[in-house]
Curated annotation (Swiss-Prot):
Region ranges (Intermediate domain): 110-155
Disulphide bridges, residue numbers: none
Record-level GO BP terms: defense response to Gram-positive bacterium; defense response to virus; inflammatory response; innate immune response; MyD88-dependent toll-like receptor signaling pathway; positive regulation of canonical NF-kappaB signal transduction; positive regulation of interleukin-1 beta production; positive regulation of NLRP3 inflammasome complex assembly
PTM entry text: Ubiquitinated; undergoes 'Lys-63'-linked polyubiquitination. OTUD4 specifically hydrolyzes 'Lys-63'-linked polyubiquitinated MYD88. Deubiquitinated by USP3 that cleaves 'Lys-63'-linked ubiquitin chains leading to inhibition of MYD88-induced NF-kappa-B signaling.
A GO CC term assigned to this protein in UniProt: plasma membrane
SMART domains: DEATH, TIR
Occurrences of domain Death (ranges): 32-109
Residues with the Phosphoserine modification: S244
Subcellular localization(s) per the UniProt record: Cytoplasm; Nucleus
Protein name: Myeloid differentiation primary response protein MyD88
Molecular function terms from GO: TIR domain binding; Toll-like receptor binding
Length: 296
């Protein structure tokens, strides 16, 4: 039941949700998208055509083909890339001539986006009152003026880092090895390790957001089975991926340092991984990681 063109059913969601991240779409909408796009036909563009429009490469698309729900995997992978948004997704579906999808799911997408906007407004209203900022490099609230051990309490000289380390408490021994290899050698990098560098007594979510977005040039994610169960690590990772396209120069670097029983997180699968478990490349591991963190 294809529409005759970019009709009214798709115009409203595109105009009102153009800048919202893909995280605004809930599982019900994603499952229905999969029902439309997973089916391979000769008369309508499927998920592979959408993947090409999203600039996925041939080998990436072939890997997605191995999954039971390739459309769902595609959306998970794409939402961490620059330019990914609800509006952009709808524009690509329009370009591919899938007006049937837009007309069928448009109201549900609009509903999800309105819920997302309302939730963001509620969270914003619950934040502490902001003080006037003279410069973008100064913390935006009084609460965040002194959050690390070397911070200026007045916020005039906020402490900065080469990388924020996202990790679980159970992985602290590897983080300590990372400190020895990257800070206490000729690399002289400066890592932000919450248990060592962050002062107690403030909101962990506000601190993480401030450090990842404003204070750290990169973010290293120590992936393990315990990481997959951590709400704090999940928030930090998704926050870093959801930053505006201009902030994606703060490259996310996933590290796998030991064997995992669970599946590697799909949201990180299309980012190059530093694999400490590979004996063939282990001797190059710290050099590669240090150079990645030293990039401008």
């Amino acid at each position: 039941m294809a529409a005759g063109g970019p009709g009214a059913g798709s115009a409203a969601p595109i105009s009102s949700t153009s800048s919202l991240p893909l995280a605004a779409l809930n599982m019900r909408v994603r499952r229905r998208l999969s029902l439309f796009l997973n089916v391979r036909t000769q008369v309508a563009a499927d998920w592979t055509a959408l993947a090409e429009e999203m600039d996925f490469e041939y080998l990436e698309i072939r890997q997605l083909e191995t999954h039971a729900d390739p459309t769902g995997r595609l959306l998970d992978a794409w939402q961490g890339r620059p330019g990914a948004s609800v509006g952009r997704l709808l524009e690509l579906l329009t370009k591919l001539g899938r007006d049937d999808v837009l007309l069928e799911l448009g109201p549900s997408i609009e509903e999800d986006c309105q819920k997302y906007i309302l939730k963001q407004q509620q969270e914003e209203a619950e934040k502490p009152l902001q003080v006037a900022a003279v410069d973008s490099s100064v913390p935006r609230t009084a609460e965040l003026a002194g959050i690390t051990t070397l911070d200026d309490p007045l916020g005039h000289m906020p402490e900065r880092f080469d990388a924020f380390i996202c990790y679980c408490p159970s992985d602290i021994q590897f983080v300590q090895e990372m400190i020895r290899q990257l800070e206490q050698t000729n690399y002289r990098l400066k890592l932000c390790v919450s248990d060592r560098d962050v002062l107690p007594g403030t909101c962990v979510w506000s601190i993480a957001s401030e450090l990842i977005e404003k204070r750290c040039r990169r973010m290293v994610v120590v992936v393990s089975d315990d990481y997959l169960q951590s709400k704090e690590c999940d928030f930090q990772t998704k926050f870093a991926l959801s930053l505006s396209p201009g902030a994606h120069q703060k490259r996310l670097i996933p590290i796998k340092y030991k064997a995992m029983k669970k599946e590697f997180p799909s949201i990180l699968r299309f980012i190059t991984v530093c694999d400490y478990t590979n004996p063939c490349t282990k001797s190059w591991f710290w050099t590669r990681l240090a150079k990645a963190l030293s990039l401008p």
